[in-house]
């Protein structure tokens, strides 16, 4: 079983995930708005990169630039609001690290479906980029491949298609979901 660590030792333990999320598995992070799900997803991507895994991070809320700053902040241990002014230090730190590669792709909310993501991954694979981990921030705002009267049914279809994508591509996919309680 090939795994990708979450970066959380307790969750990655042999008792729970046996080292991390396995290929073809779908991990869902669900919590209320504003508690740090996007930061957590970045932290999981960084843990995978530190383990030498290649990561694709799809973002539907933040820009590629802001998402990249979060990765830089996490990997270099520099506050994100200081990344730009400490650019030389960031570059120096990266030169000393042995990391997997990262691709960040931004789509406007409601514009990309699971098929869009599948096509993008296949295009990257043809160019030689082989991801071990795919992250989606947020699946809730993706475009459904079918219209339903109920949002619940559309979301169920999106999550089913993401799970199938993970299995078809033999990749770990981690997604975020907003909970409104």
Regions found by a protein language model. Give the residues of each.
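Cytosolic-facing regulatory segments adjacent to core modules
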Residues: 13-17, 52-130, 144
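Substrate-engagement module of ASCE P-loop NTPases
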Residues: 47-49, 154-181
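Structural motif
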Residues: 28, 132-135, 174
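Walker B catalytic acidic pair
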Residues: 138
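The Walker A/P-loop phosphate-binding site
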Residues: 1-78
């Amino acid at each position: 079983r090939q795994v990708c660590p979450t970066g959380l030792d307790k969750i990655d333990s042999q008792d729970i995930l046996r080292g991390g999320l396995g290929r073809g598995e779908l991990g869902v992070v669900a919590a209320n708005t504003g508690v740090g799900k996007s930061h957590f997803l970045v932290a999981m991507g960084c843990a995978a990169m530190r383990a030498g895994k290649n990561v694709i991070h799809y973002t539907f809320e933040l820009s590629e630039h802001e998402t990249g700053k979060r990765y830089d902040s996490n990997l270099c241990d520099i506050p994100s609001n200081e990344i730009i002014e400490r650019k030389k230090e960031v570059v120096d730190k990266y030169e000393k690290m042995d990391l997997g590669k990262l691709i960040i792709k931004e789509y406007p909310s409601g514009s990309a479906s699971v098929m869009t993501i599948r096509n993008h991954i296949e295009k990257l694979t043809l160019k030689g980029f082989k991801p071990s981990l795919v992250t989606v921030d947020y699946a809730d705002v993706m475009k459904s491949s079918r219209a339903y009267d109920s949002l619940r049914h559309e979301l169920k279809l999106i999550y089913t298609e993401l799970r199938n994508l993970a299995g078809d591509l033999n990749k770990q996919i981690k997604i975020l979901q907003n909970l409104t309680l």
